Amino acid sequence: MATKIRLKRIGRRNRPFYRIIIIDSRKRRDGSAIEQVGWYNPIESNKEKNYVLKEDRILEWLKLGAQVTDPVNKLMKRSGLAYRWHLMKQGLSEKQIDKA
């Protein structure tokens, strides 16, 4: 099963709110998710508080082969999780990553 980490739109008209979910890549955007791993609120003016990522769960799914969509990748870059994943792919341990 090919899994993706992507955004699921919820919220009302003109007030978008997104959940960051793990989903089978063949399902529709708002289909049933395997797991919810965060949320994103683009309306929030404070860029530091407009998203939450469960970093440990996202890294676990990435290790299992899940693919990340571009919008979620941008959120991961903003939080530093994309760099952490890059270091993990190079074979560094958790202690070495924390020092970097």
Regions found by a protein language model. Give the residues of each.
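Structured, basic alpha/beta domains of bacterial-type, RNA-associated proteins
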Residues: 2-100
